[in-house]
Design a protein with these regions (language model features):
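Protein-protein interaction and targeting regions used for scaffolding, dimerization, and localization
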Residues: 1-95
């Protein structure tokens, strides 16, 4: 079984790329803050020029899948993605 660990910076990049694609802007224009809440779970807030959108866990995972597909060149459909907080937020990906 192949395994991969995505760092917090990888997760931020994933949301930046996903949000930029969705909003038709450059990734450099997107600011991202990751979050975790006991009730809401993992998420992110992505902002462009002060206009912010919240990503729930499902949308966050979708952004990570796109990152795996487009940036890492791996098939994300069959990947198991587990978010965790160690020293920072990470994603453990396995196929």
């Amino acid at each position: 079984m192949e395994q991969l660990k995505l760092t917090e910076q990888d997760l931020i990049n994933a949301v930046c790329l996903f949000h930029a694609k969705f909003k038709s802007v450059r990734p450099e224009e997107v600011e991202v803050e990751l979050s975790f809440d006991d009730d809401a779970g993992y998420g992110a807030e992505a902002c462009i020029n002060g206009s912010c959108d919240l990503y729930n866990t499902t949308n966050f995972i979708t952004a990570i899948r796109l990152y795996i597909d487009e940036q890492l060149g791996k098939d994300s459909i069959s990947a198991r993605i587990v978010l965790d907080i160690e020293d920072e937020m990470v994603a453990h990906v396995s196929w």
